[in-house]
Amino acid sequence: MPIQQLPMMKGMGKDFKNADYIDYLPVNMLATPKEILNSSGYLRSFPGITKRYDMNGVSRGVEYNTAQNAVYRVCGGKLYKGESEVGDVAGSGRVSMAHGRTSQAVGVNGQLVEYRYDGTVKTVSNWPADSGFTQYELGSVRDITRLRGRYAWSKDGTDSWFITDLEDESHPDRYSAQYRAESQPDGIIGIGTWRDFIVCFGSSTIEYFSLTGATTAGAALYVAQPSLMVQKGIAGTYCKTPFADSYAFISHPATGAPSVYIIGSGQASPIATASIEKIIRSYTAEEMATGVMETLRFDSHELLIIHLPRHVLVYDASSSQNGPQWCVLKTGLYDDVYRGVDFMYEGNQITCGDKSEAVVGQLQFDISSQYDKQQEHLLFTPLFKADNARCFDLEVESSTGVAQYADRLFLSATTDGINYGREQMIEQNEPFVYDKRVLWKRVGRIRRLIGFKLRVITKSPVTLSGCQIRLE
């Protein structure tokens, strides 16, 4: 009697609206490529979250400050260095952050505010009119970054960006502060640094600027590098993040249907699958512009996390050798958006802000709950043909024994890729029982097709691999 191995890294089914084949992505489960028990990998629950300390409000931005060797967070109306308050931050929306030797900068409400380490707060403004230095139309700050002793910021609604003075960071450069990304007439959406370049992200192009090395007063300090220009734009100010020694970003509708790309050697390489692009396509341009991208690394996972208004998507570079590996994160037992955001390695813990409550949490690897609430984990197998076959012994390898009480796994089957039937409950975890089998002995007769869904609701970590079924 043949034994059929069933992959669980990505399920396959149909969309009931248009009958197209779609991927069923793992929910709250990460794929780990590692040879174990006749499998090429296993799936592990995303780490749980426990409360670390209270904050003033929800998370608005985070940066690791290398000058102070501390994590700076903007939560609610406050800027925090670790747990201690540093100053007040206006507004309630997302903020841009950068830091230097003498100050931590926050771009908020159209201003670049510098919180100096000596306790003073300065806002970038023009030199005094009687100084004799050029007076610039600074406008409103959209995004900020820092490179080689200077802050750089983009002017909202224009293709101009500015740099601060070397001696006094609270003023523009006294001789040549203003530069233009002339391929972006609609304005610079975001700005960043890569190696020794200033990177300006527009809606249809990404431009790079390098230092000229000029020392003459009034000479241009930066010049565009057309050989590195990328013919794609970003969807929103925070729809970009450094990733894999380059930048990952969500593209703007101006260059076609949006997707997720990684920049490499002046080219943008797509990493999104068709199912991911369908999720992204379900958002309007205005909704997409509110997206936030960030990176997270632990246990050899190189994660790119995309926070959208109704989804949190995760791309794992370490598991994508045989094709892009994506999963979905969520909170609760329904389809609530994942609450964690702004992950940062702090001390020997990974800390995170929160989208809904005024707390900072930390990831904990021996649980899968979020703030002591059970979470749902979903895995799917592909549809496969089993014409008029009888099925027995559906078995999943599970690493068990760490639960506080007996957990059950809910198994259900589909014969059309759309509707899943009644769930079969199987005990899959029990305290101190480290070799428990997860086995459904009699599945039944299959007319033509079958696929399975595995659902676990628990506070304990979940480790599953090696799904197989016996056919006759």
UniProtKB/Swiss-Prot annotation:
Functional summary from the UniProt entry: Acts as a tail hub by assembling onto the head-to-tail adapter protein gp4, generating a channel that is sealed by the tail needle protein gp26. Together with gp4 and gp26, gp10 is required for stabilization of the condensed DNA within the capsid; perhaps by plugging the hole through which the DNA enters.
Keyword Protease: no
InterPro entries to which the protein is assigned, alphabetical: Phage_P22_Gp10
Subunit (UniProt): Monomer (in solution). Hexamer; assembles as a hexamer onto the dodecamer formed by the head-to-tail adapter gp4. Interacts with the head-to-tail adapter protein gp4; each gp10 monomer contacts 2 head-to-tail adapter protein gp4. Interacts with the tail needle protein gp26. Interacts with the tail spike protein gp9; binds six tail spike trimers.
Keyword Signal: no
Gene source species: Salmonella phage P22 (Bacteriophage P22)
Record's protein name: Tail hub protein gp10
Subcellular location: Virion
Gene name for this UniProt entry: 10
Keyword annotations from UniProtKB, A to Z: Late protein, Virion
Disulfide bonds: none
